[in-house]
C-alpha cells in the first residue's frame, strides 16, 4: 500500500501536525491497513508517539477530536493511541507488531 496516496492518512498526519507540531516523535499506522489486508470498511489504527504528552486521558481527548472530525467528514473510523516517545523501543507484543507491520506517516 502506498500510504502517501491515501487521503485519509494525509488528513490524519496534517491534523496531528496542526494539533501537536514538533511534539510528535512518530505517527505509525498499524493493523490491517498497514499490513495491506484491510477491507474497505476497516478502521485506521494509529500509534501517536508524543515527546511531552499530557495525561493519557487528555491526549486521548485531543485525538478523539481529530478522529471525530475525520469521521464526520469522510466516514472513516480512526483509532488513535497516544504513547510516550521512545515506547516503540520497549519489548512487548504490541511494539513488536508495530516494528514488524507499522508504517510511519
What is each residue range found by the language model?
Residues 44-49:
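Short beta-strand->loop micro-motif that forms the acidic, two-metal-ion catalytic signature
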Amino acid at each position: 500500500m502506498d500510504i502517501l496516496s491515501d487521503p485519509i492518512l494525509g488528513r490524519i498526519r496534517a491534523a496531528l501536525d496542526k494539533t501537536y507540531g514538533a511534539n510528535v516523535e512518530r505517527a505509525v499506522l498499524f493493523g490491517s491497513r498497514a499490513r495491506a489486508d484491510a477491507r474497505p470498511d476497516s478502521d485506521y489504527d494509529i500509534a501517536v508517539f508524543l515527546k511531552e504528552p499530557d495525561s493519557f486521558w487528555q491526549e486521548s481527548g485531543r485525538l478523539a477530536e481529530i478522529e471525530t472530525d475525520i469521521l464526520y467528514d469522510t466516514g472513516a473510523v480512526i483509532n488513535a493511541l497516544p504513547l510516550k516517545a521512545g515506547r516503540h523501543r520497549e519489548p512487548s507484543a504490541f511494539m513488536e507488531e508495530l516494528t514488524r507491520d507499522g508504517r510511519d506517516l
